[in-house]
Amino acid sequence: MRTISINDPDDPRISGFRDIRERDLTGRQGLFIAEGEVVLRTLLSDASLCRPRSVLIATNRIDGLRGLLESVSPGTPIFAAGQDVLDRIAGFPLHRGILALGEKPVARTVEAVLADLPEEAVVVAASEIGNHDNIGVLYRNAAAFGAAAVLTDDRCGDPFYRKSIRVSVGAVLRMPGAAAPSLAALIDALEAARFEVIALSPSATEPMNGLEPGGRRALLLGSEGPGLPASAMARTRTVGIPMAGGFDSLNVAVTSALGLYQLTQRQA
């Protein structure tokens, strides 16, 4: 394993890592930042759908992460910098001490992703979930419960936003995903692929615990607050989570976990 020393935060070789927070907002043209040891392990694993372009590590972390760094392919440069230089490159104190610049997978259509799935599959479908933490949690929950893909509409946040990747614990990097041009188009594609679309809503009269696992199912979730539009719920099977008096909804992280458990559990 060979590292390349960086002593100048303006070194052009690490330009992709510079001013991270500003580029979070402006975009990286097909690239993303993977932050921290756990996420980098996923990026470098065989399960990853993405590949690293370069790695940047604090010099005081090299010995502790040597095993991980040795799994980086020889053609991928590993840059090393002192903590003060690393912080100046990133534009803020970088406590995790390791970053990777990765390449997003080639974008696929929702139809193409669905065409690859088996006859029995559960997918997560999301509409108007713009919060980066929530997008990350959806991917994490989808991976944890064995869902086959995460599908979104055009009003959802980018799963390759740095914080979404971190919150997902790297699940974004290995979970198939795609975005539809609208919620209506997303439901159209699911129906055409013979998925039963199940929407979660506080207004539903059918309880979620009546759902049985099996077949092709899509768990459709909307934003916290407004939820799903009536036009979408009219096209779906709508179920709710029974709650104690005074409460009618949960956040999307908990709701998605409960829904996925219900759809993926197997009876003994």
For each of these PLM feature ranges, what is it?
Residues 1-93:
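N-terminal positively charged helical leader segments and presequences
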Residues 36, 130-137, 250-255:
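Amphipathic alpha-helical repeat scaffolds
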Residues 81-82, 127, 153-154, 176, ...:
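Short beta->alpha connector loops at strand-helix junctions that form conserved
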Residues 101, 110-204:
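RNA substrate-binding interface of SAM-dependent RNA methyltransferases
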